[in-house]
Amino acid sequence: GREKDLIIISGRNIWPQDLENLAEQQPEIRTGDASAFSVTGPEGQERAVMMVQCRQSDEQKRAGLRERLHGLVSEEFGIDCLIELVPRNTLPRTTSGKLSRSGARKEYLKRIKAEQATELNESLYTSAFRQQAI
């Protein structure tokens, strides 16, 4: 399973645990609170994503943490990594209690598809409403 967890971006091989360890060095993040994986973007390129369980509710502090993590990953690994903050106890785990990167990836993709569907529905509704107004 470890080989398929490997993140390959622009020919660079990055182990997800290296990204996760970098995040876990931050005072707000506990060991086991980060899960890194890659997804294929709309143009077919790989994109690194890190889901991080965050106990912070203050939006300014959350934004600061997101920016700090993004900067650290960029500085350390030279890649653009999307940082997704999620509520605590929401990262999927295996039956033995370990983080499930594939489970986190599936949840992320499911949420993105749901958001895109919502945006599409709102867009269709808005354009239909405009047509009626004309």
Residue ranges and their predicted role:
Residues 33, 37-38, 49-50, 70-132:
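Conserved C-terminal "lid"/linker of ANL adenylate-forming enzymes
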Residues 1-77:
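AMP-binding/adenylate-forming catalytic core of the ANL superfamily
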